[in-house]
Amino acid sequence: MRFCLMVTGPAYGSQHASSAWLFARELLAQGHSVESVFFYREGVLNASELTAPASDEVDMTRNWQQLHQQHGVALNVCVAAALRRGVSDKQEAANLGLAAANLAEGFQLTGLGALAEAALSCDRLVQF
């Protein structure tokens, strides 16, 4: 089956992101495909390259990046939700006159259209 995930919780402070990541790993291990992850609301904070967890903590941003690199999972970040929460790529930072960009490598800013496309193209859309 083809799955798409939506993550609405931050990398830290809730179980949303870690549960979604563990679910994605298990799906892949079972032979399913994970087409994309859409980060929405507080979930966009998973895409910040400025997180610095302690060495004995899970680095959720890095985990998502590895999922992207190893399995080609698209990491889509809602642009409106991201900008509200201080997450920006270089292009948006330049357009808005922001001092810096902090979107982690492998993530891409997209609109809600990416979520709609995922809902249409996948067999299951699972929200965390």
Swiss-Prot record:
Q: Which GO terms describe its cellular component?
A: sulfurtransferase complex
What molecular function terms (GO) are annotated for this protein?
Answer: sulfur carrier activity; sulfurtransferase activity
- Cite the entry's keywords alphabetically: Cytoplasm, Transferase, tRNA processing
Q: Where in the cell is it found?
A: Cytoplasm
Q: Record's Gene3D superfamilies?
A: DsrEFH-like
The record's Gene Ontology biological-process terms are: tRNA wobble position uridine thiolation
Q: Does the keyword tRNA processing apply?
A: yes
Active site annotated at which positions? 78
How it assembles, according to the record, is: Heterohexamer, formed by a dimer of trimers. The hexameric TusBCD complex contains 2 copies each of TusB, TusC and TusD. The TusBCD complex interacts with TusE.
Which NCBIfam families does the annotation name? Answer: PRK00207.1, sulf_tusD_dsrE
Name this protein carries in UniProt: Sulfurtransferase TusD
Gene for this protein? tusD
